[in-house]
């Protein structure tokens, strides 16, 4: 890993040190995705079946998974894995139930009652990628809050053949329908509906460049679907002092690096000595990983930054605004006060990112690419929307009437003014 001393860098070099890999969609990907979306709109299920063979090398005759198939998958699943999933399920459920909003009702002026009500999004679609490492944990992260929020219909899509653990988690969380379809075609089907697939209002879940581009395209279509967030490559920034355990730090860096070659890991520490120890430990652990080749590409593009003190380390972290922030210092909670931007924060030696990824209870769907400056981690609020209510008595109307007439008149909105004036005259 490249080691940089922050105070030795000029402003341009500092900016370069915290630069992320480019994620702009290539024109070729955009065109392919547009073509796939159009194909699904025109041919429905037939297009999805053809795409399963073309892209996933899967021969299927139907899109919707039956209850019998779900039961069989659950029966095949290793019992230890089932129990581990149940532990995660309970913690995620507890944490998201605590986010249930309270209704707000108050009088702003005597006789003027204002309220905030929360209502669930009716139909949501959850996308779970396939591949060698099926993200069944993401089913929990998406379906549990959807269920707690009260969404009327929760459907899930994943490429054929769907992993048994994905089906087990979907059943556990009360997902209504499961579709074996993947990629941009799945996003199109969830957006516009097909003979078998329910058209949804909002789509959640990660994916490759084609899925990400498909989500971008459908979310910009007035007849399309809303999406959770635009996803970039996964990332972690670790702040460590000289007393941190370099073995723990290295394992945290590598647990992020193994996600993919474009994942970014940054260590901010306080000395050359610790930087060297951590870098050596990363190389030692890397050699033993099954996904060594993938992780090594990420590590090659990652860096260690030496800060003069913890205040500067925080400054660097806030400039970067990481998806995951791990603080391995003697008093991590003290540093938390200065954290301005992060998707999820992990405090102390025994809070590895893996805990949040799976079972602590927090959600692992997080904004990336610096979006933590303006966006939040996924939560219950993402599966619902708020509406305001106002109710004025005659007394309340009279109390505000004259002021609203003046405000409307000065904005030259005569009909607005008349709506008040006519009522005031009727009360004389």
UniProtKB/Swiss-Prot annotation:
Keywords: Amino-acid biosynthesis, Histidine biosynthesis, Metal-binding, NAD, Oxidoreductase, Zinc. Substrate binds at residues 234, 256, 259, 324, 357, 411, 416. Its cofactor is Zn(2+). Binds 1 zinc ion per subunit. CDD domains: Histidinol_dh. GO terms for molecular function: histidinol dehydrogenase activity; NAD binding; zinc ion binding. GO terms for biological process: L-histidine biosynthetic process. Its EC number is 1.1.1.23. It catalyses: L-histidinol + 2 NAD(+) + H2O = L-histidine + 2 NADH + 3 H(+). The keyword Oxidoreductase applies. Pathway: Amino-acid biosynthesis; L-histidine biosynthesis; L-histidine from 5-phospho-alpha-D-ribose 1-diphosphate: step 9/9. One of its GO terms (cellular component) is cytosol. The active site is at residues 323-324. It comes from the Bacteria. InterPro entries: Ald_DH/histidinol_DH (IPR016161), Histidinol_DH_CS (IPR001692), Histidinol_DH_monofunct (IPR022695), Hstdl_DH (IPR012131). Pfam families: Histidinol_dh. Gene3D superfamilies: 1.20.5.1300, Nitrogenase molybdenum iron protein domain (3.40.50.1980). Zn(2+) binds at residues 256, 259, 357, 416. Catalyzes the sequential NAD-dependent oxidations of L-histidinol to L-histidinaldehyde and then to L-histidine. Belongs to the histidinol dehydrogenase family. HAMAP family: HisD. This is Histidinol dehydrogenase. It comes from Campylobacter jejuni subsp. jejuni serotype O:2 (strain ATCC 700819 / NCTC 11168).
């Amino acid at each position: 890993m490249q080691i940089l001393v922050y105070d030795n860098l000029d402003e341009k070099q500092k900016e370069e040190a915290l630069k992320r890999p480019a994620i702009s969609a290539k024109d070729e990907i955009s065109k392919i995705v547009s073509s796939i979306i159009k194909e699904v709109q025109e041919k429905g299920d037939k297009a999805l079946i053809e795409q399963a063979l073309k892209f996933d090398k899967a021969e299927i005759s139907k899109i919707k998974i039956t209850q019998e198939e779900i039961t069989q998958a659950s029966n095949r699943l290793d019992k230890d894995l089932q129990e581990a999933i149940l532990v995660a399920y309970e913690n995620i459920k507890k944490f998201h139930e605590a986010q249930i909003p309270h209704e707000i009702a108050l009088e702003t002026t005597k006789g003027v009652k204002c309220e905030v009500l929360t209502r669930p999004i009716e139909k949501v679609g959850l996308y779970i990628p396939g591949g060698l490492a099926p993200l069944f944990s993401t089913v929990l992260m998406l379906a549990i809050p959807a269920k707690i929020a009260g969404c009327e219909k929760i459907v899930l899509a994943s490429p054929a053949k769907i992993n048994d653990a994905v089906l087990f988690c979907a059943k556990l969380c009360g997902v209504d329908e499961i579709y074996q379809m993947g990629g941009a075609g799945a996003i199109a089907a969830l957006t516009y509906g097909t003979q078998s697939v329910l058209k949804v209002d909002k789509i959640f879940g990660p994916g490759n460049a084609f899925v990400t581009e498909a989500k971008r395209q459908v979310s910009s279509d007035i007849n399309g679907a809303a999406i959770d967030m635009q996803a970039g490559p996964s990332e972690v920034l670790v702040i460590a002092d000289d007393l941190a355990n370099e073995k723990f730090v290295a394992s945290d860096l590598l647990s992020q690096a193994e996600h993919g070659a474009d994942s970014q890991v940054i260590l901010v520490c306080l000395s050359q000595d610790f930087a060297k120890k951590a870098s050596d430990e990363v190389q030692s652990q890397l050699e033993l990983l099954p996904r060594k080749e993938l992780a090594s590409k990420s590590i090659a593009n990652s860096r260690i930054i030496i800060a003069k003190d913890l205040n500067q380390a925080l400054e660097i972290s806030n400039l970067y605004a990481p998806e995951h922030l791990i603080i391995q210092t003697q008093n991590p909670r003290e540093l938390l006060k200065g954290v301005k931007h992060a998707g999820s924060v992990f405090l102390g030696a025994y809070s590895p990112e893996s805990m949040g990824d799976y079972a602590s209870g927090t959600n692992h769907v997080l904004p990336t690419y610096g979006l933590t400056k303006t966006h939040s981690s996924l939560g219950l609020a993402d599966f619902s929307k708020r509406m305001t209510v106002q109710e004025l008595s005659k007394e309340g109307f009279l109390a505000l009437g004259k002021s609203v007439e003046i405000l409307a008149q000065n904005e030259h909105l005569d009909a607005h003014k008349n709506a008040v004036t006519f009522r005031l005259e009727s009360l004389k």
